[in-house]
Amino acid sequence: MNLHEYQSKHLLKKYNIPVPASEVVFNPDAAVDAAAKIGGDRWVVKAQVHAGGRGKAGGVRLVKNKEELKSAVKALLGTRLVTYQTDERGQPVNQILVEQTSDIARELYLGAVIDRASQRIVFMASTEGGVEIEKVAEKSPEKILKVTVDPAIGLQPFQCRQLFFGLGLQDLKQMRSFTDIVMGLYRLFTERDLSLLEINPLVITGSGELICLDAKINIDDSALYRQSELREMRDTTQEDEHETMAQQWELNYIKLDGNIGCMVNGAGLAMATMDLIKLSGGDPANFLDVGGSATKERVTEAFKIIASDKNVKGILVNIFGGIVRCDLIADGIISAVKEVGIDVPVVVRLEGNNAQLGAKKLADSGMNIIAAKGFADAAEQIVKQVGVIA
């Protein structure tokens, strides 16, 4: 789960991590009130979306008076911001962060992530702040400093100092501030079950202060059950509606750009199914794993999600009956085709537990459901059917 910048900074403040004074607003008049509360004569207007690259897309603007402020907020609210991290439709702008300006002398990068290779938290820092860290990693990986946290003892102050001096910084007052910030970020990361935390940029002001100018936080979805405060921060308007619907039924769904819908039980089999569709000349429209405990209801909902994608021209169901019974899957398929009114070709491959009974139910249903003879045949059949439609 992702947080907006204003939500991330709200958490940072709880851990005594310095951020600029700011207010989130939902209409232009509130922006003027927010500016008066913040003070000063210049402000930064930031569109709140779950995507990077806002500045280049016009989603971050410097305003020099309250008339410009009101105009900028009015121009952004209710629009969809398209950045290099969004699709062509962009993300809806429903909130604006009005923030005080900062006297920036230097921009740095600071982040933390769970490294799957070492199975530990890794803190990263770079002198290349204010730019996409992915580009730095690609072009100049030597500019990214890393320290790995031993989970038995946690992050240590000497590791913070190691990053500080590695960034070419020397001032002792800044060293203490930097150490406090990194230690605070570590507490935030571990106590709130984060999977990603980025401060980009961490700025040094003209007066030598360190301030977190932007913040990005991702939370481990598997830990949300114990993070009630963070659960309330979820903004489903920033998420794909199909993926949101799938989560409600505990379905693992990821939308893709193809036209062949896939419904499979098991993540490995689902990926193999997509590979075989590609090898057969087709393009998968999604990854959808109904899981090992698939029920008739979940299969029906899975069909609804796939069918709601207007790009889908055919559906391939690939089920291996280990834990799940193929006859129950067949019941779900029949129910879904009737209820949803599927008007595209459906190819089904059933193998394993009660596969013959499931195939018989499909054959006796009287519906236009194509039974495949095997894995490869299923992929070839659906690609052929979709090709006929195209």
From Swiss-Prot:
- Indicate yes or no for the key word Glycosyltransferase: no
Please share the entry's free-text remark on the cofactor: Binds 1 Mg(2+) ion per subunit.
Which residues does the annotation say bind substrate?
265, 322-324
Task: Identify the stretch annotated as signal peptide in this record.
Answer: none
Kindly list the GO CC terms recorded for this protein: cytosol; succinate-CoA ligase complex
Per its record, the protein catalyses: succinate + ATP + CoA = succinyl-CoA + ADP + phosphate; GTP + succinate + CoA = succinyl-CoA + GDP + phosphate
Is Ligase included in the keywords of this UniProt record?
yes
Q: Which GO terms describe its biological process?
A: succinyl-CoA metabolic process; tricarboxylic acid cycle
Q: Tell me, what is one Gene Ontology molecular-function annotation carried by this entry? A: ATP binding
Q: What is its EC number?
A: 6.2.1.5
Report residues binding Mg(2+). 200, 214
Q: Which cofactor does it need?
A: Mg(2+)
Per UniProt, ATP binds at 46, 53-55, 99, 102, 107
Domain ATP-grasp, by residue range, is 9-245
What keywords tag this UniProt record?
A: ATP-binding, Ligase, Magnesium, Metal-binding, Nucleotide-binding, Tricarboxylic acid cycle
Pathway annotation: Carbohydrate metabolism; tricarboxylic acid cycle; succinate from succinyl-CoA (ligase route): step 1/1
Q: Which HAMAP family match?
A: Succ_CoA_beta
Q: What does this protein do?
A: Succinyl-CoA synthetase functions in the citric acid cycle (TCA), coupling the hydrolysis of succinyl-CoA to the synthesis of either ATP or GTP and thus represents the only step of substrate-level phosphorylation in the TCA. The beta subunit provides nucleotide specificity of the enzyme and binds the substrate succinate, while the binding sites for coenzyme A and phosphate are found in the alpha subunit.
**PANTHER family found in the cross-reference section:** SUCCINATE--COA LIGASE [GDP-FORMING] SUBUNIT BETA, MITOCHONDRIAL (PTHR11815:SF10), SUCCINYL-COA SYNTHETASE BETA CHAIN (PTHR11815)
> Family, per the entry?
Belongs to the succinate/malate CoA ligase beta subunit family.
Quaternary structure, per UniProt, is:
Heterotetramer of two alpha and two beta subunits.
**What protein name does the entry list?**
Succinate--CoA ligase [ADP-forming] subunit beta
Q: Which organism is it from?
A: Coxiella burnetii (strain CbuK_Q154)
